[in-house]
Amino acid sequence: MLHIPSVLTSAQVIEIRQKLDAADWVDGKATVGAQGAQVKKNRQLPELSPVGMELGQIILKALVSNPLFFSAALPMRYMPPLFNRYEGGEHYGFHIDGSVRTIPGSNLSLRTDLSCTLFLCEPEDYDGGELIVSDTYGEHEVKLPAGDMILYPSSSLHKVEPVTRGARVCSFFWLQSMVADDGKRSLLFELDQNIQKLREKLGDCEEVVGLTGHYHNLLRQWAAV
C-alpha cells in the first residue's frame, strides 16, 4: 500500500469538484455484482458518463507524469476512472474487488492488479468515510488530503466506513500492471527508489549504472507486455 501525494493540483481538484457537484449521480449498486450489492450503499457517476470520462482523462494525464506512481504500479492498462460520493450514513462494507473487469465501451478486459482511490475532498470536510484496507499486517485506515491517492493490491479486503457528516467524494479505478506478482513488483519498486537515492548522492557512478542495469534486467524477465 502506497500513499502518492499531490497527484492533482488544488486548481485541478476545484475544477473537478465543480463539475462533479453539478452532475447527476446514480445508485452505486449498479456497478457491482450480487455480493458487493449486499454491502454497498453510495452513489456514483454512470460508467459512461461524459462528465466522468472527461474528468477521468485529467486524472490519467496527471498520473502519466508522476514518477512515484509509475515506479510503484508499472501500469500497462487502466480502467477509466470512476467517481463516488458518500454522505448521510452511506458506506461500503468489507469486500474484495473483482479479479477481471471489462473496460466500458470496449471488448477489452484487464486483470485488476492494483486499486486506486484519489481523494477529492479534504479530511476535515466530512466525518467517517475512512478507507480500511486489511492485509497480512493488519488493518490500515486511510483518509488523505484532496489530490492525494492511495494505491493498494486489488486482492486486499477493504471497506469504507459510514460518513456521518459532510460528503466524501473520490475517484477510484483499477489497473493491470506489467508485473502481476505483488512481491516482485514491490521488490522492483524498492530497488528503483534506492537507485534514485543513490543517484542523488553519487551521480551516475559505475555502481549506480550497474544497479540500474540489474533493475531493467529483472523488469525484462518479469514484465508481460
UniProtKB/Swiss-Prot annotation:
Source organism of the structure: Herminiimonas arsenicoxydans
Q: What is the name listed in the Swiss-Prot or TrEMBL entry for this protein? A: PKHD-type hydroxylase HEAR3399
Q: List the disulfide bonds.
A: none
The cross-references to InterPro entries, in alphabetical order and at most eight, read: Oxoglu/Fe-dep_dioxygenase_dom (IPR005123), PKHD_C (IPR041097), PKHD_hydroxylase (IPR023550), Pro_4_hyd_alph (IPR006620), Pro_4_hyd_alph_FE2OG_OXY (IPR044862)
Q: Which SMART domains does the record cross-reference, listed alphabetically?
A: P4Hc (SM00702)
Against Pfam families, the record matches this protein to: 2OG-FeII_Oxy_3, PKHD_C
Might you give the EC number(s) for this enzyme? Answer: 1.14.11.-
Q: Which GO terms describe its biological process?
A: DNA damage response; intracellular iron ion homeostasis
Cofactor: binding comment: Binds 1 Fe(2+) ion per subunit.
